[in-house]
C-alpha cells in the first residue's frame, strides 16, 4: 500500500495531535532513619505541615516536623518493612475520614476504616480531620437539655446540648459507666453518639461494644477505636476523627454526643510522638502545645445558631487523675477548657455511693439554662441540703447529742444520698427523676427506712404509671410543676405510702 507524500504528512500530523503527553511529576524523598513510629525523611523540600505522604510499602504517614534538611513524619500504621533508604512520596493532600450515616453501628479505627468485620463502609462524604472550630456568630448559647438518665447529674450538674462537660476521677471510679449510661439514655431521642476509645485495652472496648449492643444503643452509635497496641499516631488522631464524624451530623441540623475515653492517654500519646520528634519538653515532659492539642479539639463541640440549622455536638471528655490530684497539668488544662466537670471519688465509690459523684466539686457552668423547669423546681435546694448534710455528718461523728432539727436534717440527708444512688446501665426518664426527688425533698421518705428506699423507688414508678398516668404525662408535656400537679403528686405519694409501707 502506497501513500502519497501529503497523506503521510497528514497522518503524522494527526498522530501528533492525538498523542497524550500526560506527565505526572512526583516529589519523593528518602528515609534517613525510622524508629518508634516516626520516620526522618530527606528530600521532601516542599512538604507542608499536616500533609499526607505514602511509603514504599503502601502505608500512609503525616508530616509533623519541618526541619532545615529533613522532615519528621509519623507513620499511620505498624511501619513494618520500612528501612533507611526507602522512598517516600508526597500526596499533596491533608488527611480526610469518611462521615455520614453509613458509619452508624460500626466500629472503625482512627482513619475511619472498619475493624468490626462487617464489610466495607460506603461513605457518601469525606471530611478533613483538622477543621477550624465555629466562630462566635455561628453559635447559640446552650439552652436544650441533654438528659443523661442519671439522677445526680440531671438534678445537680445538668448538661445541655452543645456543652463540654468533663468527667474526671481516679481509675475504677465509674467514669466510663457514666458515659455509657448517657449514650444508652439517648435511645429514641434522635441523638447520634460517638464513643472514642483512646489507648484502651481491646478487651475493654469489646466489653463496651457488647454493652451498647445489649441495650440497643449501637443502632445510633459509632465507635472509634485506637487501642493500646495501636501506634501513638493513631491514638493522637482518633479524637479528631471522631469529632469530624460528629460535626457532619451537627452541620446537618442533627444532634450528636461524643465521648473521649480518655484524654489523659491522648496527651500521653502526643507526648510520646513529640519526644521522638525531639520537640522540647515542658512541664511533666509534655510539649508546650499540649493545651492547644485539647482546646482545638473541645472547641469543635458547639450548639449552632438557627441560621446554620440549630444542630449540636455535645462533648464528654474523660480524664483519669492520679490519687485524686486535680491540680496536675492535664486535668487543670481540660478543666479550664470545658464548661464544667463531674468529679468522681474513690472513697464514695468504695462506700457504695454509685455513681460516685462528689456534689461539692462537680459543677455545670452553662447547663443550668438547659435544665427543665420541673427538675429545677424539685432539686433547687438539693445541693445546699447535701452540703449541709456532709457538714453535719462530719460533726455527728464527734458529738452524740444532736438537737432535733439537726437530727432530722441528718436523716433526710441520708435518704437523699440513697435516692441519688443508681445501678449502672439503668437510666431514668426526666419524669421519673422529678417524682422521686420530689418525694425526697418534700419529706415523703423521712419515715421510710434507708435500706428500703431502693425498693420504695422501684415500686413507685409502676404504681404512678398504673394509677396516675397523667402525672408523668403532664411532666413530659408541661416540663414544669404547677400547684395542681404538685397536689396530685402529693396525693399519689400519700396513697402509695399507705398501701406499701
From Swiss-Prot:
Bilayer disposition of the protein: Peripheral membrane protein
Location(s) in or outside the cell: Cell inner membrane
Presence of keyword Glycoprotein: no
Site positions per UniProt: Required for activity: 362
This protein's GO CC annotations: plasma membrane; proton-transporting ATP synthase complex
One Pfam family per UniProt: ATP-synt_ab_N
Sorted UniProt keywords: ATP synthesis, ATP-binding, Cell inner membrane, Cell membrane, CF(1), Hydrogen ion transport, Ion transport, Membrane, Nucleotide-binding, Translocase, Transport
This enzyme's EC code(s): 7.1.2.2
InterPro entries (UniProt xref): ATP_synth_asu-like_sf (IPR023366), ATP_synth_asu_C (IPR000793), ATP_synth_asu_C_sf (IPR038376), ATP_synth_F1_a_nt-bd_dom (IPR033732), ATP_synth_F1_asu (IPR005294), ATPase_a/bsu_AS (IPR020003), ATPase_F1/V1/A1_a/bsu_N (IPR004100), ATPase_F1/V1/A1_a/bsu_N_sf (IPR036121)
GO molecular function (one): ATP binding
Catalysed reaction equations from the record: ATP + H2O + 4 H(+)(in) = ADP + phosphate + 5 H(+)(out)
Claim: rRNA-binding is one of the keywords in the record: no
Residue numbers binding ATP: 169-176
Task of the protein: Produces ATP from ADP in the presence of a proton gradient across the membrane. The alpha chain is a regulatory subunit.
Quaternary structure and interacting proteins, as annotated: F-type ATPases have 2 components, CF(1) - the catalytic core - and CF(0) - the membrane proton channel. CF(1) has five subunits: alpha(3), beta(3), gamma(1), delta(1), epsilon(1). CF(0) has three main subunits: a(1), b(2) and c(9-12). The alpha and beta chains form an alternating ring which encloses part of the gamma chain. CF(1) is attached to CF(0) by a central stalk formed by the gamma and epsilon chains, while a peripheral stalk is formed by the delta and b chains.
Family statement drawn from the similarity comment of this UniProt entry: Belongs to the ATPase alpha/beta chains family.
Protein name listed in UniProt: ATP synthase subunit alpha
Originating organism: Campylobacter lari (strain RM2100 / D67 / ATCC BAA-1060)
Amino acid at each position: 500500500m502506497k501513500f502519497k507524500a501529503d497523506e503521510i504528512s497528514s497522518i503524522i500530523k494527526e498522530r501528533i495531535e492525538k498523542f497524550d503527553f500526560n506527565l505526572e511529576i512526583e516529589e519523593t524523598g528518602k528515609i534517613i532513619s525510622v524508629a518508634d513510629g516516626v520516620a526522618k525523611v530527606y528530600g521532601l523540600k516542599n512538604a507542608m505541615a499536616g500533609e499526607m505522604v505514602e511509603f514504599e510499602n503502601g502505608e500512609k504517614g503525616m508530616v509533623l516536623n519541618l526541619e532545615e534538611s529533613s522532615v519528621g513524619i509519623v507513620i499511620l500504621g505498624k511501619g513494618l518493612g520500612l528501612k533507611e533508604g526507602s522512598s517516600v512520596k508526597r500526596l499533596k493532600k491533608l488527611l480526610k475520614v469518611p462521615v455520614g450515616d453509613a458509619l452508624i453501628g460500626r466500629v472503625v479505627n482512627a482513619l475511619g476504616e472498619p475493624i468490626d468485620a462487617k464489610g466495607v463502609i460506603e461513605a457518601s462524604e469525606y471530611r478533613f480531620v483538622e477543621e477550624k472550630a465555629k466562630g462566635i456568630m455561628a453559635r447559640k448559647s446552650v439552652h436544650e437539655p441533654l438528659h443523661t438518665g442519671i439522677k445526680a447529674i440531671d438534678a445537680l450538674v445538668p448538661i445541655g446540648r452543645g456543652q463540654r462537660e468533663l468527667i474526671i476521677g481516679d481509675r475504677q471510679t465509674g467514669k466510663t459507666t457514666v458515659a455509657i449510661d448517657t449514650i444508652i439514655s439517648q435511645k429514641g431521642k434522635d441523638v447520634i453518639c460517638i464513643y472514642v476509645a483512646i489507648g484502651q485495652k481491646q478487651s475493654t472496648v469489646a466489653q463496651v461494644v457488647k454493652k451498647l449492643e445489649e441495650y440497643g444503643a449501637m443502632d445510633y452509635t459509632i465507635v472509634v477505636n485506637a487501642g493500646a497496641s495501636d501506634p501513638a499516631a493513631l491514638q493522637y488522631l482518633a479524637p479528631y476523627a471522631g469529632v469530624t464524624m460528629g460535626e457532619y451530623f451537627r452541620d446537618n441540623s442533627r444532634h450528636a454526643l461524643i465521648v473521649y475515653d480518655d484524654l489523659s492517654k491522648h496527651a500521653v500519646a502526643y507526648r510520646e510522638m513529640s519526644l521522638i520528634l525531639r520537640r522540647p519538653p515542658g512541664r511533666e515532659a509534655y510539649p508546650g502545645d499540649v493545651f492547644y492539642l485539647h482546646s482545638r479539639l473541645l472547641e469543635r463541640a458547639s450548639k449552632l445558631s438557627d441560621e446554620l440549622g440549630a444542630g449540636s455536638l455535645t462533648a464528654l471528655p474523660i480524664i483519669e487523675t492520679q490519687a485524686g490530684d486535680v491540680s496536675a497539668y492535664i486535668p487543670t488544662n481540660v478543666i479550664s477548657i470545658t464548661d464544667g466537670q463531674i468529679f468522681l471519688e474513690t472513697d464514695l465509690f468504695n462506700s457504695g455511693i454509685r455513681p460516685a459523684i462528689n456534689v461539692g466539686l462537680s459543677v455545670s457552668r452553662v447547663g443550668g439554662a438547659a435544665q427543665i423547669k420541673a427538675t429545677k423546681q424539685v432539686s433547687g435546694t438539693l445541693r445546699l441540703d447535701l452540703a449541709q448534710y456532709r457538714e453535719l455528718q462530719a460533726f455527728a461523728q464527734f458529738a452524740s447529742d444532736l438537737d432535733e432539727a439537726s437530727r432530722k436534717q441528718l436523716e433526710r440527708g441520708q435518704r437523699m444520698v440513697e435516692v441519688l444512688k443508681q445501678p449502672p446501665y439503668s437510666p431514668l426518664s426526666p419524669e421519673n427523676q422529678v417524682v422521686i426527688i420530689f418525694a425526697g425533698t418534700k419529706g415523703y421518705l423521712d419515715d421510710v427506712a434507708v435500706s428500703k428506699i431502693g425498693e420504695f423507688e422501684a415500686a413507685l414508678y409502676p404504681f404512678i404509671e398504673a394509677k396516675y398516668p397523667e402525672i408523668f404525662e403532664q411532666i413530659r408535656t408541661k416540663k414544669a410543676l404547677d400547684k395542681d400537679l404538685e397536689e396530685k403528686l402529693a396525693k399519689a405519694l400519700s396513697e402509695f405510702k399507705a398501701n406499701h409501707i
